[in-house]
């Protein structure tokens, strides 16, 4: 009997431990669409688990050994540790236990793939690639790290031959993904608790790109010095570069902003040789969101679209219709002329980029509210956090969202406030709770101002509740 070389059609129920996670849920949804029976557990129910249940998954609230039931295989994320009752029960029974990235890799082997990696911008870039391939008629399967507004989900199963996936570098598992086209947006020190050193992280990204087949393509942002250095080390594979710099194959030019909308042209410099030396230009492009970083992300998607044969007009129209992704500069409301934004940014590079985008989107003042995510991140990047809020007129820092970590001396909310002031910020303060945030906004915000809530923890709920809180008290 020949051994199976791809995911078998019959596995028995597939059990996900932590099915409500953004990465796990996308894989579960695609598996269900392919006809597999899916079940899973999470500590508590959520919109994500409710959606999966509506689609046909069996959902257990809480994690207990008996939840495994008749499962034939168990999928776990890196958040699931030894001692978890469901993991221990699966191993007691001798069931296959599969890491999330391993199951994603099995799905990817059924298709040709675009995998998007980078310290920042993965989710937005994944959404942009999906948007362009949709517009090009490719009908891609998509597994993303955020909810795509056009889908109402972080995943969809398409009938086409291409799959678009977000490749997470946080635990090194992205090197297991069999990418046909590999995108790298940027490389900054992050997730050092896994990598140990920046050199190890650099090596991880090089391995990710080097894994593409000989007929594949590496798509790299040469505006970022670490990525440009990576390009210099790549051999024997095709590379397309993108960015604002004059050497990029796909280059944004003539960029300006009007009412928070980016207007620009795209010079396809890498196609000059195919065009008798003339550089083709996609003129009159618009992207309905501010931020140079978002324009850069769009260039990565354009590089993929051109590689797959999409026409300039198709690309221009698709960019103009881009619907965005949840928690990436998401406008959650406006009260008395004050706009409230919810954003996932929690690394200093991301925070600086988001606040620059806020400046481009408003003529008023920018009020930043940040909840640091993990003591370890705040500690290791403390000086960067003290200087990344320069574009904000007012900075309010909430209590650190620990994500299960123990406090680290010198890396608290009050330490960061003191650090901001010491580094010259004119108006930095602590914010104690939602009520304090409401008082701050009433005290500081005027019509035309923008309140930007930043972080990967519970700050999103504060942002989404703020318009109603302000409206109720005003009534």
Curated annotation (Swiss-Prot):
Protein name per Swiss-Prot or TrEMBL: UDP-N-acetylmuramate--L-alanine ligase
UniProt GO MF annotations: ATP binding; UDP-N-acetylmuramate-L-alanine ligase activity
Biological or metabolic pathway of the protein: Cell wall biogenesis; peptidoglycan biosynthesis
Family the entry assigns: Belongs to the MurCDEF family.
Main function: Cell wall formation.
Main location per the UniProt record: cytoplasm
Keyword Membrane: no
Location of this chain's protein in the cell: Cytoplasm
Reaction equation(s) it catalyzes: UDP-N-acetyl-alpha-D-muramate + L-alanine + ATP = UDP-N-acetyl-alpha-D-muramoyl-L-alanine + ADP + phosphate + H(+)
Organism: Paracoccus denitrificans (strain Pd 1222)
E.C. no: 6.3.2.8
Keywords linked to the UniProt accession: ATP-binding, Cell cycle, Cell division, Cell shape, Cell wall biogenesis/degradation, Cytoplasm, Ligase, Nucleotide-binding, Peptidoglycan synthesis
Binding site for ATP: 118-124
InterPro entries on file: Mur-like_cat_sf, Mur_ligase_C, Mur_ligase_C_dom_sf, Mur_ligase_cen, Mur_ligase_N, MurCDEF_pg_biosynth, UDP-N-AcMur_Ala_ligase_MurC
Gene: murC
A Pfam family this chain is assigned to: Mur_ligase_M
Gene3D superfamilies xref list: Mur ligase, C-terminal domain (3.90.190.20), Mur-like, catalytic domain (3.40.1190.10), NAD(P)-binding Rossmann-like Domain (3.40.50.720)
GO CC, alphabetical: cytoplasm
């Amino acid at each position: 009997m020949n051994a199976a070389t791809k995911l078998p059609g019959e596995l028995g129920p597939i059990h996900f431990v932590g099915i409500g996670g953004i990465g796990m849920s996308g894989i579960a949804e695609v598996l269900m669409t392919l006809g597999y029976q899916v079940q899973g557990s999470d500590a508590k129910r959520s919109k994500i688990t409710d959606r999966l249940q509506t689609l046909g998954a069996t959902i257990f609230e809480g994690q207990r050994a008996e939840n495994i039931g008749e499962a034939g295989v168990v999928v776990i994320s890196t958040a699931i540790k030894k001692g978890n009752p469901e993991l221990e029960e699966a191993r007691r029974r001798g069931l296959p236990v599969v890491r999330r990235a391993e199951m994603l890799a099995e799905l990817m082997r059924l298709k040709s793939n675009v995998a998007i990696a980078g310290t920042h911008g993965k989710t937005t870039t994944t959404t942009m690639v999906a948007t362009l391939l949709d517009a090009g008629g490719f009908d891609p399967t998509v597994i993303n790290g955020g909810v795509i507004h056009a889908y109402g989900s972080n995943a969809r199963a398409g009938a086409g031959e291409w799959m678009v996936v977000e490749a997470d570098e946080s635990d090194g598992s992205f090197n297991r993904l069999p990418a046909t086209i590999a995108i790298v947006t940027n490389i900054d020190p992050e997730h050092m608790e896994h990598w140990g050193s920046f050199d190890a992280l650099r090596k991880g990204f090089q391995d990710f790109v080097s894994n593409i087949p000989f007929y594949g393509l590496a798509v790299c942002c040469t505006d970022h010095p670490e990525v440009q250095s990576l390009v210099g080390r790549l051999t024997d594979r095709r590379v397309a570069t993108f960015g604002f710099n004059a050497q990029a194959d796909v280059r944004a030019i003539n960029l300006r902003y009007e009412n928070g909308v980016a207007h620009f042209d795209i010079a396809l410099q890498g196609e000059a040789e195919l065009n008798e030396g003339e550089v083709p230009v996609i003129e009159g492009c618009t992207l309905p969101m501010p931020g140079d970083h978002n324009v850069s992300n769009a260039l990565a998607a354009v590089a993929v679209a051109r590689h797959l044969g999409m026409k300039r007009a198709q690309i221009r129209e698709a960019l103009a219709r881009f619907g965005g992704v949840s928690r990436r500069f998401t406008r959650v409301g406006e009260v008395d002329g004050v706009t409230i934004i919810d954003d996932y940014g929690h690394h200093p590079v991301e925070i600086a980029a988001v606040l620059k985008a806020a400046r481009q989107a408003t003529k008023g003042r920018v009020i930043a509210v940040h909840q640091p995510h993990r003591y370890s991140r705040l500690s290791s990047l403390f000086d960067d956090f003290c200087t990344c809020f320069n574009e904000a007129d007012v900075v309010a820092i909430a209590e650190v969202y620990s994500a299960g970590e123990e406090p680290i001396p010198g890396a608290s909310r009050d330490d960061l406030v003191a650090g901001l002031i010491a580094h010259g910020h004119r108006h930095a303060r602590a914010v104690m709770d939602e009520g304090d945030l409401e008082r701050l906004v009433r005290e500081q915000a005027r019509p035309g101002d923008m309140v930007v809530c930043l972080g990967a923890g519970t700050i999103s709920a504060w942002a989404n509740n703020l318009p109603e809180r302000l409206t109720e008290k005003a009534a």
